Regions:
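Cofactor-binding beta-sheet edge motifs in enzyme active sites
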Residues: 1-408
Length: 408
């Protein structure tokens, strides 16, 4: 049994990255062995070697359409569970699991696997199912990512709904707004708030899997973070589309794509919409993000200057993910060792970013992560509008665009 005193630094956030305990354990064991205080500093190479990305996922979606409307949606997700790695010495920690609504008794669904897969669109019949890939859970152990919920689920949902809109011959903006109507469970909560621990399906569409958040313990309720429900998200979408010039005539091989997101399983969601203008070279598949238009309703904005900087930074992070960021595994280890192999966005690729903060006067919520979630689907939808190529995986490389153009 170790007796170790940990000196904490009271500074900064890490978008979830500081919840990993590996460095703490290593320092604790070293301090115990040498009998002296130990400060552990990783090299960049060791940091890459011990990184934990989000889990690889595979998605299968089906849509039921009738009279020009989306009336049913089924979303199956195969992925690794995130919870086991944080449950030291156990298979799962109960605080990482949520109830399976098939029987409402057993906590056997990893909440992080389906975050973002439900949404604020009104679809009368909506089912989400998560399938645990045990091999993936342990081969590619997952951790936090700067997105709030899972950006890959939001990428899938927004890309799929865009495909449905085109299949129905409807304008993607009008189609989204028609479903962000605040009906049913998507109305949000009343101004009076609700009791701590209230299941999120209180204010969401019917789910195959229930999404109670938080599951246990005493929590201070957020009185008005979800007031307005889908209508606040629709307002963000109108603003973002307007700032991007949705519907205007564009140069050849240039398109605008839309996307919205809000962490539906959280008690304090932030409402965000994004529009991306993209130009594609049809000969090479290379594309440039010309402009990102982001509209965000964070309730009450306490510091507009810092909030704008956070929104811009998260949007760049989203652009970096869709353009080039990728981790490869070889013989169980991450192949990339430093930034000469792992390629985040470079200054030459930075688009113009136009931010609109919507002051709704409601309870303040977070701004550091949400805008990253709308960039990738907006870019993917813009590429389709530019050259008719639908890419269904990330990152969206020039090779992937060319391949999609051949299939189109």
């Amino acid at each position: 049994e170790l007796e170790v005193y940990v000196h904490n630094y009271i500074l900064g956030g890490g978008f979830g990255g500081k919840q990993d305990y590996d460095d703490i354990l290593a320092a604790a064991y070293c301090a115990n062995d040498v009998g002296r205080p130990v400060k552990l500093i990783q090299t960049r190479e060791s940091q890459f070697a011990t990184s934990f990305p989000r889990t690889p996922t595979y998605h299968k979606l089906k849509a039921g359409m009738k009279d020009g409307q989306l009336v049913a949606m089924n979303h199956d997700i195969v992925c690794g569970w995130m919870g086991p790695r944080f449950s030291v010495g156990k298979k799962y920690g109960s605080d990482w699991l949520q109830l399976d609504s098939v029987d409402g008794k057993e906590k056997d669904i990893d909440q992080w696997s389906i975050g973002g897969s439900d949404h604020w669109y009104y679809v009368p019949n909506h089912r989400v199912r998560a399938w645990n890939s045990d091999r993936t859970t342990w081969a590619v152990q997952a951790s936090a990512l700067r997105t709030v919920s899972n950006s890959y689920n939001m990428f899938v949902v927004e890309s799929f709904l865009d495909e449905v809109a085109h299949k129905l011959g409807r304008d993607p903006l009008e189609f989204r707004l028609s479903m962000l109507n605040g009906k049913g469970g998507n109305r949000g909560i009343p101004n009076t708030g609700y009791a701590p621990g209230t299941p999120s399906d209180y204010y969401m569409d019917r789910l195959w899997i229930s999404l109670p958040w938080p599951q246990e313990g005493s929590w201070i309720p957020y009185e008005s973070a979800t007031v307005g429900g889908a209508l606040r998200l629709a307002n963000c979408l109108r603003v973002a589309a307007g700032k991007a010039g949705w519907g205007k005539k564009l140069p050849p091989n240039t398109g605008i794509g839309l996307a919205v997101s809000s962490a539906e399983e959280r008690q304090s969601p932030t409402w965000v919409a994004g529009a991306a203008e993209v130009t594609v070279d049809p000969k090479t598949g290379k594309y440039r993000i010309n402009r990102l238009s982001i509209a965000m309703d964070m309730g009450t904005c306490i510091n507009p200057l810092n909030a704008t900087a956070q929104i811009q930074g998260a949007a760049l992070w989203g652009a970096s993910q869709v353009l080039s960021e990728r981790l490869d595994y070889k013989e169980g280890a991450i192949r990339q060792t430093n930034f000469h192999e792992y390629k985040p966005i470079r200054l030459a690729d930075v688009p113009e970013i136009d931010v609109e903060i919507i002051e709704s006067g409601h309870h303040p919520s977070g701004v550091g992560e949400p805008s990253s979630t709308v960039v990738a689907p907006a870019v993917a939808n813009a590429i389709f509008n530019a050259v008719g190529a639908r890419v269904r995986h990330m990152p969206i490389t020039p090779e992937a665009v060319l391949e999609a153009m051949k299939r189109a």
